[in-house]
Amino acid sequence: MRSPAPSLPDIIAALATAPGRGGIGVVRVSGAALAPFARALTGREPKPRHAAFTHFVDAVGKPIDEGILLYFPAPHSFTGEDVIELQGHGGPVVLQLVLARCLELGARLAEPGEFSRRAFLNGKMDLAQAEAVADLIEASTVVAARSAVRSLSGVFSDEMHRLTDALIDLRMLVEATLDFPDEDVEFLENARALERLDAIRVKLERVLERARQGALLRSGMNVVLVGQPNVGKSSLLNCLAGDERAIVTDIAGTTRDAVRETIAIEGIPIHVIDTAGLRETADPVERLGVERTWREIARADVILRIVDARVGPQPGDDAIDAALPEGVERITIFNKIDLCGLEPARLQHDDGVVIQLSAQLALGVDLLRSELLRVAGWHAHGDDVVLARERHLVALRDALTHVVAARSQCGALELFAEELRLAQIRIGEITGEFSSDDLLGVIFSRFCIGK
C-alpha cells in the first residue's frame, strides 16, 4: 500500500512560469502555515482564495514588484498544504528578486516535480494523474493535450480502480474458501469464479489496447527519410510539414545534417527526420552527415526509403537496403511521379509497401499519411483515449499475464489467489497504491521545477 505521507515541514518555492520575458510571471510557494510568510512578503494579511493586488517587498519594506497575491490554505490547494502564488511582471530579473526574497524568508528551492509529488503524497491526486500533469505540459498535439486532460481528471485512474475492485472481490471469495479444500471445485462453479476471471481478462485486454493507443499519442514515432542524394527527401519533409524547413535544390548532397520536424496525423506526433543522402563521398562534411544518417536510422521506428520514380531503384539503393537494420518497418516511396506519368498509388510488393507520390505537387501524400497511421497501429478515436506511459503498458501486460496464469491454476486455490494478488499489485503500481520511493523519485524528477 502507499506509505503514509511523510512530515514535510519545510517550505518550497519556485518559478511556475517558463524562463524568459513575458507579461506575467508566477512564483509558487508551498508549505505549512504560510500566512506569516505572506504577511512578511506583502505587509498585509492574506485572505483565503482571494486575489489581492499588493506590493512584494524586501526585508526593509522596499517594493520589489507589484502584482497579485493568491493564498490557498491547506487542505484546499494543489499540494494539500498552504500555497501562495505571487503573480508579478514577467521579467527574469524581477522574478529572481521575488524568488530570492522567498528564500530569505525560509523557503528553499523546489526540486523538479516536488509540488506534484507533495500533491500525490497528500492524497490530492494519484500517480497516474500526477504524470498527466507533466504530459499535459509536454503535449505536442491538440489530441494529446485533450487526452492528458482526461487522464488528469481521473478517467484512466477510474478504470484502474474498477479493475482493482474486481480483483479484490474475487480474491475475497477465493481466500474465504481456502479453509474448505474439499469444496474448491464447487466454489469455482457456484461463485462463477472463472466467469468473473474471464470478464477481468477481457477488461484488461481492452484497457491495454487503449493504453497502447495513448502511449502512441504521447510519444509518437520516429520516421527517417533515407535514400540517395537528390531523390526528393527534403521535398517530402517540406510537403509533410507544410513548410520549407529543408533546403531543396537540384544539387546532390545539399542536406548535410539531419533536419527534424514533428507533424501531427490525426493527433499522433510523427517525428520526421530528413537525412543526408547515402553515398560514398570524398567531402568530409558530407561524409559526417552520412555517418549521422546511419545513427538516426538505428533509432528509427519507420524508414521511408525514397527512390526517384523516373529511374527506379539503382545499384546504390540495393546497398542501402541491405544495410538497413532488421525488424524496422520500411516503406518504399517512388517520388517524382509527376515527371514520369505514374499515378498516385499504394502497392503491395513482396518486399513491402510501395507508395507512388509527388512531393513537389503533394500528389499521393495522403496515401503516405494513411500508411504511417497503419504502421503505427493507430485505430482509435482521440475522444476515447487517455495518455499512457511505457511503465503503464508494462504493468498492464504483467497484470494480464497473472490473470491468464490464474485461469490455468483453477484447480489449486492457493495459486489461483496468488496470481490474483500479483495482478492487483501491478495495477496498483499505475496509480501509486503500490509504489517504491525509487520509482517516485524517477517519475517526479522528470517534471519541470514549478510543478
Swiss-Prot record:
CDD domains: trmE (cd04164), TrmE_N (cd14858). Mg(2+) binds at S234, T255. InterPro entries: G_TrmE, GTP-bd, GTP-bd_TrmE_N, GTPase_MnmE, MnmE_dom2, MnmE_helical, P-loop_NTPase, Small_GTP-bd. (6S)-5-formyl-5,6,7,8-tetrahydrofolate binds at R28, E85, K124, K451. It is found in: Cytoplasm. GO terms for biological process: tRNA methylation; tRNA wobble uridine modification. It is an enzyme of class 3 (hydrolase). K(+) binds at N230, T249, I251, T254. Residues 220-377 form the TrmE-type G domain. Keywords: Cytoplasm, GTP-binding, Hydrolase, Magnesium, Metal-binding, Nucleotide-binding, Potassium, tRNA processing. Binds 1 potassium ion per subunit. It comes from the Bacteria. PROSITE patterns: G_TRME. GTP binds at residues 230-235, 249-255, 274-277. Its cofactor is K(+). Homodimer. Heterotetramer of two MnmE and two MnmG subunits. Exhibits a very high intrinsic GTPase hydrolysis rate. Involved in the addition of a carboxymethylaminomethyl (cmnm) group at the wobble position (U34) of certain tRNAs, forming tRNA-cmnm(5)s(2)U34. HAMAP family: GTPase_MnmE. This is tRNA modification GTPase MnmE. It comes from Aromatoleum aromaticum (strain DSM 19018 / LMG 30748 / EbN1) (Azoarcus sp. (strain EbN1)). The lineage of its organism: Bacteria, Pseudomonadati, Pseudomonadota, Betaproteobacteria, Rhodocyclales.
